């Protein structure tokens, strides 16, 4: 029995798409195919997929809303799991519990509707709740670490555990999940009672700032670089004269140099080449080495062509 036949038998009823292009699921609008793109409807289907992948030595990864990633042009081998159907959100007193696939911006709006404060900083951050925890997303002085109460995860071995904020060892755009290989299932956020109008005014203010300063009209991967200590990445890039600098179809935004936008059918290789070139030019100009915030996943087109027709099974 082939892997595909076994997969269809054991994972019957789960939405699996074969050789699915990932560019339509990514904010950058680039990316090759996933061998198997999976849309679990609940944590039990997710656990079944992970168990099968581990048993068959098939690599797997979970993507949130793919808002701060670049998928290479050769795509991703093995399973790519999209959890956007795990999107339930509930409110209990001053606590919001959200599944990993819940939209982060919509979750902040739910907090607003219940006059709960503490989530305003995230009102314009694209992505999923799970992805936000994974990278400790933040903006305007706030971050997920400030409001997370607990997090339920599926370990890489298929066990369900509940972790505290301390367990997650949050840092700047970092959580322990990045090393553990666990998958966020749901999150509890501890908020505080507030005044609806005051919360709305703050969210409107932050939304206006984002619209004013960021190139939201173009596909992008969000902030490309982490903030260097004592500096701002966008300012360093601008001072190096790189606003409008372009490779292929991707360019450094004129509006905010910390963003790279897809202006003309750019490719993942265009993004990678531009990122590397900007790092080198900023280093040459200021002596500061920028560190990527955006994650780059998958294989280059040349590597993918070498293994066309299959993949080499490997441990995740």
From Swiss-Prot:
PANTHER family associated with the record: UDP-N-ACETYLENOLPYRUVOYLGLUCOSAMINE REDUCTASE
Cofactors, names only: FAD
Subcellular localization, as worded in the UniProt entry: Cytoplasm
Lineage: Bacteria, Bacillati, Bacillota, Bacilli, Lactobacillales
Known EC number: 1.3.1.98
Reaction catalysis annotation: UDP-N-acetyl-alpha-D-muramate + NADP(+) = UDP-N-acetyl-3-O-(1-carboxyvinyl)-alpha-D-glucosamine + NADPH + H(+)
Source species of the chain: Streptococcus pneumoniae (strain ATCC BAA-255 / R6)
A GO molecular-function annotation: FAD binding
GO biological process, one term: peptidoglycan biosynthetic process
Annotated protein name in UniProt: UDP-N-acetylenolpyruvoylglucosamine reductase
């Amino acid at each position: 029995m082939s892997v595909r036949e076994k997969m269809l038998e054991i994972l019957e009823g789960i939405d699996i798409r074969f050789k699915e292009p990932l560019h339509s699921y990514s904010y950058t609008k680039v990316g090759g195919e996933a061998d198997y793109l999976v849309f679990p409807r609940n944590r039990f289907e997710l656990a079944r997929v992970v168990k099968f992948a581990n048993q068959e030595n098939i690599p797997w990864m979970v993507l949130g809303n793919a808002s701060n990633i670049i998928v290479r042009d050769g795509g991703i081998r093995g399973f790519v799991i999209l959890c956007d159907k795990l999107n339930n959100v509930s409110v209990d007193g001053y606590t919001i519990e959200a599944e990993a696939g819940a939209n982060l911006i919509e979750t902040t709006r739910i907090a607003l509707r219940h006059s709960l404060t503490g989530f305003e900083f995230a009102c314009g951050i694209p992505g999923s709740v799970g992805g936000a925890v994974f990278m400790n997303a933040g903006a305007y002085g706030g971050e997920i670490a400030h409001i997370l109460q607990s997090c339920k995860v599926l370990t890489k071995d298929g066990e369900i555990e509940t972790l505290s904020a301390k367990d997650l060892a949050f840092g700047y755009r970092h959580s322990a999940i990045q090393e553990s290989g666990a998958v966020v299932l749901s999150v509890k956020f501890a908020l505080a009672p507030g005044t609806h109008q005051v919360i709305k005014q703050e969210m409107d203010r932050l939304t206006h700032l984002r619209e004013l300063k960021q190139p939201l009209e173009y596909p992008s991967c969000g902030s490309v670089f982490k903030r260097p200590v004592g500096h701002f990445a966008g300012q360093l890039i601008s001072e190096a004269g790189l606003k409008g600098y372009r490779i292929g179809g991707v360019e450094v935004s004129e509006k905010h140099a910390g963003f790279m936008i897809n202006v003309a059918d750019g490719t993942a290789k265009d993004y990678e080449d531009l990122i590397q070139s900007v790092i080198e030019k900023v280093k040459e100009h200021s002596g500061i080495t920028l560190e990527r915030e955006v994650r780059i996943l998958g294989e280059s087109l040349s590597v993918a062509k070498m293994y066309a027709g299959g993949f080499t099974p490997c441990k995740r």
